[in-house]
Amino acid sequence: MAFVLSLLMALVLVSYGPGGSLGCYLSQRLMLDARENLRLLDRMNRLSPHSCLQDRKDFGLPQEMVEGDQLQEAQAFCVLYEMLQQSFNLFHTERSSAAWNTTLLEQLCTGLQQQLEDLDTCRGPVMGEKDSELGKMDPIVTVKKYFQGIHDYLQEKGYSDCAWETVRVEMMRALTSSTTLQKRLTKTGGDLNSP
């Protein structure tokens, strides 16, 4: 597990870069919060990974969309924002409170909320008047379906400890992928297909 955490931390550290390419300032704090959120998710581990193998599931993380080169700036920004919002919604529930260490869960929710607030400063400049249109675009719908699948899985499994552990691991994967998108947003201006 220490190797996995080290690998995740290395991925996040590589994603540090100067902000400001979006016509607004994506603060360094956004990346620091991302790293801290991954660390908190790792610390929330309560069960041996081997004890929940029967509950593993492929939730269909739209990884090629998050890590690939197919999104323009506004789309990428919206996907990142939606992933963080849905992650916050997932962990900011009564059922989630019953499953996790309250202190760690509150810290995670605070970190996710901080990332959302940092991104809110860029919503206007990036999205402009297109806000309502972008909410209906395919990448956002894909992210919403992905998270709906996670909610459905938890309900189907009765919000069991193993179900939550499976979701915790999946959220580490999703948030790690979202750091790739954050990195691209801080390094490019306008067209995410640029080198």
Swiss-Prot record:
It holds the Pfam family Interferon. The keyword Disulfide bond applies. Its main location: secreted. Disulfide bonds join 24-122, 52-162. It is found in: Secreted. Residues 1-23 form the signal peptide. Keywords: Antiviral defense, Cytokine, Disulfide bond, Glycoprotein, Hormone, Pregnancy, Secreted, Signal. SUPFAM superfamilies: 4-helical cytokines. Glycans are attached at residue 101. Constitutively and exclusively expressed in the mononuclear cells of the extraembryonic trophectoderm. GO terms for biological process: defense response to virus; female pregnancy. One of its GO terms (cellular component) is extracellular space. PROSITE patterns: INTERFERON_A_B_D. One of its GO terms (molecular function) is hormone activity. Transmembrane segments: none annotated. IFN-tau genes are intronless. They evolved from IFN-omega genes in the ruminantia suborder and have continued to duplicate independently in different lineages of the ruminantia. They code for proteins very similar in sequence but with different biological potency and pattern of expression. Belongs to the alpha/beta interferon family. IFN-alphaII subfamily. Paracrine hormone primarily responsible for maternal recognition of pregnancy. Interacts with endometrial receptors, probably type I interferon receptors, and blocks estrogen receptor expression, preventing the estrogen-induced increase in oxytocin receptor expression in the endometrium. This results in the suppression of the pulsatile endometrial release of the luteolytic hormone prostaglandin F2-alpha, hindering the regression of the corpus luteum (luteolysis) and therefore a return to ovarian cyclicity. This is Interferon tau-10. It comes from Ovis aries (Sheep). The gene is IFNT10.
